[in-house]
Amino acid sequence: MSSQLPILTVSQLNRQVKGFLENEIGLVHVEGEISNLSKPSSGHYYFTLKDSTAQIRCAFFKNRHSSSLLRNFNDGQQIVASGKLSLYEARGEYQLIVEEIVEAGMGVLYQRFEELKIKLASEGLFNPERKKTLPRIPETIGIITSPTGAAIQDILSTLARRFPIARVIIYPSEVQGQTAPQQLVNALKLANAHKRCQVLILARGGGSIEDLWAFNDEYLARQIAISEIPVVSGIGHETDFTIADFVADYRAETPTAAATAVTPNCIELFNILDTAIYRLHDAIIRLIKGLQLKLNHLIDKIASPRQAISTYWQTLDYLERQLISAMTQFINLNINKVNIFSTQLQASNPKIQIERTKIQLQQLIMQLTQEIRIKVNQLKNQLSTNLSTLHAVSPLATLDRGYAIVSKNQRILFAAQQAQIGDTINIRLAKGSLACEVTQIKD
């Protein structure tokens, strides 16, 4: 037996194991079948959680649950128990101290989702009558999403294809993680404070329930509900539903579908305009024909046909001119609108912007090259001046005038008394050096 290891009592050993289980392992989620469920008068619940090959004792204390919580749980039922491991010291049995129980298959997150969904639905946040109508032709569209994700690219490409003249404002936010809900709320508040957008898109790509959990935040749902600007959700894929989808004024299956929902199609607008012009022209023709019929009817009734015909023909000519003028003005007005749309579409052509940027870049390169040359010349001149100054004050320059430097053992001598007869000294000249022996010392 090793003398270096302490000898423990059973109580001490169990206490150490209990401390390790409680402090090192942390919260666990365990799925299994309830067995040996006991509900004593103390209000605590005790049961065994087992699978086909193993089991663990569980304790669900009164202060952790409501009195009616386990009424629907019985022996043989599959559950997921969440809690921390501990040790019952008296018998040396480790056990799970349960903090929460849900039915197996539902999952903790799904249960929270359903509870919040029921709560908000009971408050009327999902009611169709409180949802705002989307604008038919928005001038400015706000996008709340990650600026680096795939969703933003899908949205921007769809907007550029369907309605390129719309202005777009991006309100960046994280869409996953602990800080994402608050950032999404802040972006919604900022967009409402700006009052520049007619509609907002709240979007992110697909993912698991954990990835999309930021959009199941209660505070975010309430912020969507009180938004003065209509909110369109485009979260995940077609089968994904979040609390934000239920509260939003319109739920789109994907970010691309959200961009489609908030924009008209330019081609459809032109078709509508063409149809309106055709209908107006048809109405004018019908009106003229109707007036002609009335005129013919009156001609048959009047006693003086020529005078009556002349009067009504003048009236008919006047009305015809007025109708043709009104039709022409309407057509010209819509042609101007089409020209404006065409000009705006041409201005948004990226090729023109790229050429402008190229010219600006070339000018900047030429300017930078000139400035670098000037700076290098200045540094060269300064270096030459410094070298001249250093040479003037250098001890080696003094040697050029016939002076010498005397040293012994690599130490410079300043007085004759620093050397003794027989010493070997070194004399440094402007060119070369001399090794000399001291034969005489004079003051």
From Swiss-Prot:
GO terms for molecular function: exodeoxyribonuclease VII activity; nucleic acid binding. It holds the Pfam family Exonuc_VII_L. It catalyses: Exonucleolytic cleavage in either 5'- to 3'- or 3'- to 5'-direction to yield nucleoside 5'-phosphates. InterPro entries: Exonuc_VII_L, Exonuc_VII_lsu_C, NA-bd_OB-fold, OB-fold_nuc-bd_dom. It is an enzyme of class 3 (hydrolase). GO terms for biological process: DNA catabolic process. Its EC number is 3.1.11.6. One of its GO terms (cellular component) is cytoplasm. It is found in: Cytoplasm. The keyword Lyase does not apply. The keyword Nucleotide-binding does not apply. It comes from the Bacteria. Disulfide bonds: none annotated. Keywords: Cytoplasm, Exonuclease, Hydrolase, Nuclease. Heterooligomer composed of large and small subunits. HAMAP family: Exonuc_7_L. Belongs to the XseA family. Bidirectionally degrades single-stranded DNA into large acid-insoluble oligonucleotides, which are then degraded further into small acid-soluble oligonucleotides. This is Exodeoxyribonuclease 7 large subunit. The lineage of its organism: Bacteria, Pseudomonadati, Pseudomonadota, Gammaproteobacteria, Legionellales.
